Amino acid sequence: MILTIKPLKGKECNVQVTEDEKVSMVKELVSERLNIPANQQRLLYKGKALADEYRLSDYSIGPEAKLNLVVRPAGERSGMASSSSAVSGVWQTLSTVLAKHFSPADAAKVHEQLIKDYERSLRQLSLDDIERLAGRLLHPDSEGMDTSYMD
């Protein structure tokens, strides 16, 4: 199938892939065509960011789909390091709590399932969801904002 990749700025390109192709491979093909390093690319489909380790079929991406491409600045990844260490600290704390209440084998299973559920929930957030959440967190006293999604 042929996918159209549309950068926010610049010309779009087409890539030939299969439904079973991983997102990381699509990024490599885009890198060859547009000279944008794969680690600086963020591909979006219907407003949702695509994770490298998933296949196109996992997102129900079919023939002639159009993916949006956001190019990250070269040094942006370093800013996420402190955020990821905070997240790993949360998972470490969770492991400690689970160890107090479950056997080691059960604690590991619960921990693994919680991580999967968390990551699945994040993948399902659209850009609109993230924008509303950010607005609510940045302006908690705003009366006119739609807060129905927070229930």
Swiss-Prot record:
One Pfam family of this chain: ubiquitin
Name this protein carries in UniProt: Ubiquitin-like protein 4A-B
Function: Component of the BAT3 complex, a multiprotein complex involved in the post-translational delivery of tail-anchored (TA) membrane proteins to the endoplasmic reticulum membrane. TA membrane proteins, also named type II transmembrane proteins, contain a single C-terminal transmembrane region.
InterPro entries: Ubiquitin-like_dom (IPR000626), Ubiquitin-like_domsf (IPR029071), Ubiquitin_CS (IPR019954), Ubiquitin_dom (IPR019956), Ubl4_C_TUGS (IPR041421), UBL4A-like (IPR047154), Ubl_UBL4A-like (IPR044724)
Subunit text: Component of the BAT3 complex.
One MF annotation (Gene Ontology) recorded for this entry: protein-folding chaperone binding
GO cellular component: BAT3 complex; cytosol
Entry keyword set: Cytoplasm, Transport
